[in-house]
Amino acid sequence: MSDNIFFSKEFKENLHKYEEARKNGSSIFLEPGQFTDIAEYYHLHGDLKTALKVIDDALNIFPGATEPLAFKARVSILVYHDVDKAMGCVAMIADKQDLEYFYITAEIMIVDNRVKDAEKYL
């Protein structure tokens, strides 16, 4: 993802809406990718706890959504070094034909030192 998205008007509006909803204790409806963009923003700014809260909010609305589950899987492998948890996230992805599903699965294989398996998989 390009950092430029964080400077877009749409992103700033979505971030503001999300933060206002959290402050007021209300819910907000965004698309899975929009929630994930907000989570990436928080993670980039060193706030992993809030990033994961955003992802949980997304998954409460869209339980099988690719983008939030892929984000959660990446955090599992890159931050927590937990391949099993990452694979659990990937297993919950509803659209097994989404390219991101294939990419995150291969990334997990690579982190798990199964590079040849990842090459065959892709």
State the predicted function of each range.
Residues 37-38, 72-74, 105:
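Structural register within alpha-helical repeat arrays
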Residues 63, 95-98:
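Short coil turns that delineate tetratricopeptide repeat
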Residues 58, 89-93:
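Canonical positions in the second alpha-helix
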